[in-house]
A protein has these predicted regions:
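Class I S-adenosyl-L-methionine-dependent methyltransferase catalytic core
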Residues: 305-384
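C-terminal reverse transcriptase regions that engage the nucleic-acid substrate
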Residues: 32-151, 268
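RNase H catalytic domain
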Residues: 1-2, 209-273
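C-terminal functional segments of enzyme domains
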Residues: 39, 43-51, 88, 92, ...
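Two-metal-ion RNase H-like nuclease active-site motif
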Residues: 153-166, 205, 306-310
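Catalytic palm active-site di-aspartate
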Residues: 1-5, 18, 30, 34-45, ...
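A short, polar/acidic, helix/strand-boundary loop motif
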Residues: 175-203, 211, 228-242
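Catalytic palm subdomain of template-directed nucleic-acid polymerases
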Residues: 1-21, 44-54, 91, 229-242
Length: 384
């Protein structure tokens, strides 16, 4: 009650000062009684529950205009598209950056120059499928996302640093209250290596989150990158189709794994370890040609799993890798039983001995490919 009385006293003072100054307050728009819930600036402020929401009439108008858009496809006006974009972006105080990421292609459609009110065949637009995906997203999620908690702060639990070079990316992660850390390294596909620096840095962020999936799931993550554009695009999206797709992959990963990520730029001088990881050349990463594999497979195949590979060198649909990479079944081939599989084995030289012992321990079968090296320590293991 003391708080209410104090607030009422402040309200009376302001009202009195306005009158003394010769100003007339608009009584229809003024609230002089303390309240914890009101609609202001197009937003519903609920200080009792500490939430911000978009008023239902605004939500209904957005859903209505989205429905009109779908009904009129493929012929719509830029006036209609602009109306949708404006309504979506106006949700940002309540839904956050998703309003920007999930409206980028609709925004780009606005620049598809045409008469303002003349029906336009949007199916001729390069990003028409993506525009339709964004419309469907807001039809499905507009109501679900319409709430923002006030005064809610969660301190980051996991710190991740990433970087990318011309041929690979790397990064490390650790809990804030622990000294132990984990790291990842991944070589790029030849096509990925041709991307610009923004594209490679975006891949580094995406691959790092996927690699540390078990570590970051359900956590608040602070991720550092030394590329300013990547830090912005990851959170807000891009008009570039390629970069926007990468931003969407990051967004979808976080949504599916309940990860709250804050991406921030830091100078390269503070990102030296991740930078050094991205420049590592893995000389143990070797493989055989497809022609050689096909020949061996014709004699002893088909092989069911490649135990030592990566996404760019795997010879089987199922494979294990040194670090996480796309489609990898696991990151430690020695942690599983090899029995019941026809194993394709092309291990790093320093793991050849362990591979032989693990194959025997599992009672498994497979083909082991090694360099012809009679003076090597592992060579004698074949003649026991």
């Amino acid at each position: 009650m003391e708080l209410v009385a104090s607030t009422q006293s402040c309200s009376d003072t302001v009202r009195s000062d306005l009158v003394k100054a010769g100003l007339v307050a608009n009584c229809d728009k003024s609230i002089w009684i303390p309240t914890q819930c009101l609609d202001w600036l197009g937003i519903s402020w609920d200080l009792l529950n500490a939430t911000l929401t978009v008023p239902q009439p605004r939500v209904d108008r957005l859903l209505s205009v989205l429905g009109v858009f779908k009904d009129k496809l493929p012929f719509v006006t830029l006036h209609l598209v602009t109306s949708i974009v404006g309504k979506i972006i106006s949700l940002s105080p309540c839904v956050g950056n998703v309003s920007l990421i999930m409206s980028r292609f609709l925004q780009s459609a606005v620049f598809f120059r045409h008469d303002w009110d003349t029906p336009l065949d949007l199916s001729r637009f390069q990003f028409f499928p993506q525009c339709l995906d964004e419309v469907n997203f807001w039809l499905d999620n507009c109501v679900k996302l319409n709430c923002k908690k006030l005064f809610e702060y969660s301190q980051p639990v996991v710190i991740v640093c990433t970087d990318a070079s011309d041929f690979a990316c790397g990064g490390h992660a650790h809990f804030v209250d622990k000294e132990e850390f984990d790291f990842f390294y991944q070589a790029f596909f030849s096509m990925e290596s041709t991307l610009d620096s923004n594209g490679r840095e975006m891949l580094a962020i995406l691959y790092a989150l996927r690699s540390f999936k078990a570590l970051v799931r359900g956590k608040v993550v602070k991720l550092y990158t030394d590329n300013k554009n990547a830090s912005i695009i990851s959170m807000k999206g891009s008009m570039s189709l390629r970069l926007q797709r990468q931003a969407l992959e990051i967004f979808q990963f976080c949504a599916m794994n309940n990860v709250t990520v804050e991406i921030e730029w830091i100078p390269r001088s503070l990102n030296e370890y991740a930078d050094s990881l991205s420049r590592v050349v893995d000389f143990n990463d070797w493989s055989v040609s497809t022609a050689f594999f096909d020949y061996i497979a014709s004699l002893f195949g088909p092989f069911t799993v490649d135990r030592f590979a990566s996404h760019y060198s795997a010879k089987c649909a199922r494979f294990y890798s040194k670090f996480w990479c796309p489609s990898s079944e696991g990151v430690d081939a020695f942690s599983v039983d090899w029995a019941g599989e026809n194993n394709w084995l092309v291990p790093p030289v320093y793991l050849i001995g362990r591979t032989i012992f693990h194959l025997e321990a599992c009672g498994a079968r497979g083909v082991l490919v090694v360099p012809y090296w009679p003076s090597a320590v592992f060579w004698q293991l074949f003649f026991r």
